[in-house]
């Protein structure tokens, strides 16, 4: 499909016929299977016939494009853009008859036509090959020519795409009908394909069999098709015969598929084509919107220039695209050649009816195509070919068969078609008027001419042309038009995209056909109506949406049509009949009936869509059944939703649609912009720009266009605005209420109709949006964001308060088929024609809408924007708009299907629930923002679109679901780590508190402006836990995306630990009870404090270890027996305290500032690096006030570590550094030295802290080492548990007693440091230096460990980000220390180390702060940068919040960062750390008296860090040496802590299970679990 699309793009660009191939190729490329049929269909419904395929395969696909293109581009003969001047415009019974005389100008259509029919907007440029006129005469030669051309192109297609032919055959089968709609609309060959295959059922069958068959027998059937083109009857016989044989087998399948492809396919193709077109060429879609039709009319007229050449007789389908114009001429000629078309049609009807009564419709299409292929077929190709693009099915079926046999039906259809044509003409005028005006005019003119020439053909042709060309045009044509003429045709790929949708829709049409197989005429009405209705409803909806915004333009064309009856004779009374009576009664009734929406559904929506809906419902139901999972994302989704209540899709689509409604209400521009951004339609962006302008025009421009452009009824602006808007509001309420009520029905309608509605609501500007949205929305069909885009488009129209519309939406599963757009327009009258013809009636509709809250009152000025679609919708029914907005808002978070239902139930809540903060906020404030709506529209454009897009992206990624908090109660901490672990956290973190998320969203909206942000910082700090835990998500739900990452926990999981999510998570999981339990404890508190924004007292409570423990439930000391919870709780509590302290730190910022380490850790790990200077964490660690909880925890950790570290100084150093240092020793040491610091053990602890810090610094390279250690850690989880458990247990045990044991700890620290330094300075020749280094290393690592301990609990994920360096340092340091400690402890005597330690402690006390600050500051800097990035991404939500309060500390943080950055560099640049650290160590240690010693320590740490990278794995090897040194005091603590090294003192080096022996088992368990947890934390962090 891509190749074909590219091929078609190439061909289309290469030549006009390639553009037609764009249509054909576009159809084929979009869906893989249907793409080819579409291609074949695009090439020609009959192009699928090998002949046609040959000439149209190359011709129809290429000839249609190639002929059109080669005729237009390649063949200069038919390359002229035919200008059609509208001689006559008759609106009879809602049917628009345009007599367009084709001036065979190579350039543009007459400016009169432009001005009259499409003022500037509708530029009908029918680029027909000279052959278009000649097509009748030179049809055979042209057919041959184009056959050759097509053949060559088809060879190109077939040769370049041998599979393309097969795929084309196949895709033609799948998309042939869609392409029949798409290409057949503009392809006589296509039409012939229609004729032979009825392009919908038959051609799809043919597509399957005949496509392959025809592709196989390109020359064979191609000649037949050529003959069809040349001799419509003969070729049609061949084509039909080919189709009959080939299609008969595939008849059922092709019928089903063809119905999908043709009815649903027409829709799907249109939608999909539009989508593909918009997606592929959504930007060109507006101009290309006519292009599918316009490739029929413009591309086909341009491309139809070959079609014009093919115009004669059946004019080979490919030449028929020129015949489109030519057929518009040929439509006149069709009157002349009607014998041929009639005979052809009759033959085709006979053959096709024989082929398939059900197919008969498709055959009608085929017959239409055949007729079009023949002069009548040219006429139909004029009509049908113009609409071949999108609406060929409708046009051809009703026109063709109705033309021949069901003239009555055709007339009915023609009324419908005329209504549609009127709609579509305006739509075309609008869609084309923007970008496809000439093509629209061409198509309209072609349709009109074709209609006039071939009354039956024009009727259905017009209807279909209006429908499909409008859709196809708007979809394809818009895309194509948006794409340059060539690009337009090239943009027929939207037909490809449309093909899936069209296939989907075609099944509806086919189902209609199947439903009415015997009634070929009726089926044509049925099919034409259900497919046409689908197309009309959807396409008309799209067209209406496109046309209705253009409605001003169409009205303006209507003004020319109306005003300049000389040029256009527009009979508006019929329109009025159609639109007003039906619309008003339905409006009033439906408004009342619709429930939420007051706006009545368009009467046509009711009646037409009702009739068609029934058929289409079945079709849709069948379609949903037939095409439930196809790539008809939007159309089919919506069809599915309509049909099958595809829960997710339905809700999603409904959400999307509803959201889009709100967007459209709020901002059509936003809708368009959001569409493109949401849909990620890069191609759509250009049309978006024009659609954006169009959207603005749509808002202002419906009235402005009405008043300005719509010189027609300038005075009627109000009436017109409401009427123009009224249909969109009608659709909008339909969509809106459809969304709430018939979710299943809604998606079908929203998919196409809503999108169409959206453009309709959009206004002329919305014309582009429609085509853009048609393409884009349909393009959105597959992506959720596309869906959202589509629904945004839909919601845009839904913005208009037509609440009654939802009834329509409910009415039919084919709500998409409602004649929603047609009904909208038809509701006014023949809907669009009614609007064009009866702008006065439009006033009435607004009155009805006014009844719907939408209102004439909101007219507030004739030209005022108040009645603009968005304004009117916004103004009209705030409640309804709210509903729509609610629906809308949940549209974006498509992942929140329940939200949609909830939102439907709880509008405000769900508004909040809207991930879209702006949307939710706006939703809440919509009543307030009535006056602000204009600004809000802009706001929506910028902020909302950005937020919406981001949110859509996020929610596409994140599935927001409501989960029980208890799910995370078990393992809240791991839940934290699960923040972005795929299974656990992403769901909890977003899903967790949708209500709170919504509330948070609204609160953030309101409170973000207040002082809330700072609290959010705190919350953010805690949110990770909260999010990770059961409760966090309420505060985290909103912050989860922002807050959690800010906390750096999610970031860590996502970024740093995305690589190692399992280790962190696993380590916690392995220490599952403890990590899970421990998080459970802090999270509630964190959650309460953060979520509740606990005041300082609560923070202090949480801060205090006891309080934290008590509050946490399994606090540090409380759960001491279970060391895992305590350890995890300890770490978590540290961070919890840090979080509280962070807040407290904000109060005590200066105090903490002095001791940057604590704050750094707090800030870093609180995820508020900005808020916390590195020293703050250090101070918090050492800060007495903050030390209470932290020191208590740290005391436990320190005590453990001191016991472990002191008792097993060497061993513990090894253990801590090797494994436990990553988690336990680093944490324990950090806590240890912090406690020592806090308790006056500062001299010993600072040394260790410095040593640790620098070991941590040097450990950056050990990050990998830490990872190794981490890997090691998981394997030796027992060892880690023992080590960590003992150390942490001791720390926890010492939580309250540590200060008592402070001296003990200090002594043990000294011993530990002695052994640690000895092990730490393996490469340091000077014991003193080594001791200093070790002390500094210990201190730095202790600080880091403390930071990690706090930071980890605070935000393990947060730690993961900042700690990645720090913990890596710790890991490296720990591993280095462990490894080095094992060997160095032997080497260096404890006394030397102790002597050095004493010295280093003095220096390190200050150095500790500096180094901690530096490390933390650097981490904070990193976090700050990440936070800023995240904030930037999140719209500075947290930038404001975080920056708000932390700004006090940023300078300090910066200072710390300056200091820390070098340290971090040291840490990171392990190889260069040795050189850096000494130089950096002065930076860190310059203030310290023992600067040299610190430098030496740093150097030793660096040296060890260098050694460390190998050491993390080596730590176990060093284990043997360490055992002898550790025994002095450490044995027990060491065993407790490092009880897993070879010796209990050095168990860390050992597997980690020996610890139990030396350590009390409880301590060992503690050591085990905490160590594992911490090791896990530390390791995960690295």
From Swiss-Prot:
Sorted alphabetically, the keyword list is: Acetylation, DNA-binding, Nucleus, Repeat
Residue numbers of the DNA-binding region are: 575-587, 1007-1019, 1440-1452
Positions modified as N6-acetyllysine?
Answer: 808
Q: Where in this protein does the record put region Disordered?
A: 1-76, 124-246, 278-416, 446-513, 595-617, 709-787, 845-880, 1128-1155, 1182-1215, 1236-1265, 1429-1461, 1470-1489, 1507-1582
- Quote the cellular component terms of the Gene Ontology held in the record: cytosol; nuclear body; nucleus
**Where is there biased composition of kind Low complexity?**
278-298
Report the locations given in the UniProt record: Nucleus
- The answer to whether UniProt assigns keyword DNA-binding to this entry is yes
Question: Does the record carry Signal as a key word?
Answer: no
Where do Polar residues bias regions lie?
Answer: 18-27, 126-141, 213-229, 368-388, 770-787, 845-871
| Stretches with biased composition (Pro residues) | 1509-1533, 1546-1559
Q: What top-level branch of life does the organism fall under? A: Eukaryota
Q: Which GO terms describe its molecular function?
A: DNA binding
Where is composition skewed (Basic residues) in this entry? 1137-1150, 1439-1448
Query: What binding partners and quaternary form does the record give?
Result: Interacts with SET.
Protein name, entry field: SET-binding protein
Organism in which the protein naturally occurs: Mus musculus
The lineage is: Eukaryota, Metazoa, Chordata, Craniata, Vertebrata
Q: Which gene encodes it?
A: Setbp1
